[in-house]
């Protein structure tokens, strides 16, 4: 989009994001030119102690986008709505498992528990089966090992467009243009919303003038056609909050997720 002259990217994997966070903190003075992209798991993994730091140990630059969560079923499943899934669960809770791509207590599990609790079910009673790869989760869905899959909306859209799944519920307040026929949870009487945000963080101690420069560049990004093309293609929603507003947003999510994790016995 021409907003910066050049930029490089490094995928610093390891420790569920902890390696990148630790690197920024431990080498703060020499990394004022580095931004880190992170998402909801920084809140979850800090709460559970997967790594010793949390978002407060970094410079909060800007929240950028959100990816809603979705519940999907196999293309040939008799389940076509959340009402159908809840009816199947009421008839046989043990045989109505929900799968996901994260460990128990991870984001996919928490979303499934949040949705089921909002539907009046006991979140502790939901049978959740984790899978370490999307292919394994899809195989389980198609074989009937799980009745539904908790996943990100953008991934659900890709699977639905490929004819592999049906989206039976989205955790957005309103329908999303990327899948206009997919009903929200709210439409189906399930009073819950959830968004997996993505945002930019910087090393602690970042000078104020450099922070403002980064925030201004991100704000300008939203007005570019290049950004809109990427956003629409992925079904993302713009969630722009900088500095203190970003902190307030993260603290609110930390409380909601923390309360649910305590109820589920993960804290």
Q: Language-model features: where?
A:
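A ligand-binding cleft/hinge motif common to bilobed small-molecule-binding domains
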Residues: 40-50, 113-120, 147-180
